[in-house]
């Protein structure tokens, strides 16, 4: 039946017309999808949770705010022993103080800068000493720590590219490598927080996209290598949650923009002009003020990856517009996605 269906000409397959709208300029394009390869109504469920969380140790990086802060509290409520890695614990950050105020022996904040090898190794020792039986290992690692920026390629300094990569990519690699011995002993889980921009590129986001594409590749390689050892590796690819994570305030956007413009080579400023530059900054401000403020879909995805007997390889917590755009940009010829989304 399937072979017969696949052998039929595409024109004979029952299709569904779908109108795609580009939010940036309102342009609509009609695409024809075929159920044999695509079903827009199919939704994943997280009903296969089987592994008990009680007492299992999990380290989450980047818990000062955003996803990490919410994850630390949520996983603690589920019964995990949570080690919350915080960049600003030594500075008494408000997020750290709130986590510490729970006064639970199952939620412990630790100083952790994922760019600092010494701090990462100290975190390993802290976790190991906090385990009931270190020989049984640690159940989960959630690589959540990350930073973001914006700016077209000619507007972005090499220092910015390196800074974003050091946190998002090398921080993930560094932390994972250090904790793998404990994770292997438990046959546990690695959950890497990537982004929809780790699957599809976007203008003015190249420093971020590069690092998240790298996280995707690293996660795939690690998944292949860990499979025979019983460690499961998942990637969570959130959509636009900037409004929920407070990555960009209007003041921060303007500060970044001013620094960027001031540091541009004279030839770049002259060729592009201030009007073009300001238009791009205004577009970034609009994007940063949009998106979901409810992070529960991301929290639920990470929880499933840590607790399901058979976790998914990839999770896509995002609204329908971004999910559809990702399908178009990753499954269709580049000429089609370029026509829809490049202006």
UniProtKB/Swiss-Prot annotation:
Transit peptide from where to where? 1-46
- Residues found modified as N6-succinyllysine: 103, 259
Location(s), subcellular:
Mitochondrion inner membrane; Mitochondrion matrix
Residues holding NAD(+): 59-83
User: Looking at the record's lineage, which domain of life comes first?
Assistant: Eukaryota
**InterPro entries named among the record's database cross-references:** NAD(P)-bd_dom_sf, Sc_DH/Rdtase_CS, SDR_fam
- List keywords of the entry alphabetically: Acetylation, Allosteric enzyme, Glycoprotein, Lipid metabolism, Membrane, Mitochondrion, Mitochondrion inner membrane, NAD, Oxidoreductase, Phosphoprotein, Transit peptide
- Where N6-acetyllysine occurs, the residues are 73, 103, 132, 177, 212, 258-259, 280
Q: How is its activity regulated?
A: Requires phosphatidylcholine as an allosteric activator for enzymatic activity.
Tissue localization of expression is: Expressed in liver.
The glycosylation sites are 219
Catalyzed chemical reaction(s): (R)-3-hydroxybutanoate + NAD(+) = acetoacetate + NADH + H(+)
State what protein this is by name. Answer: D-beta-hydroxybutyrate dehydrogenase, mitochondrial
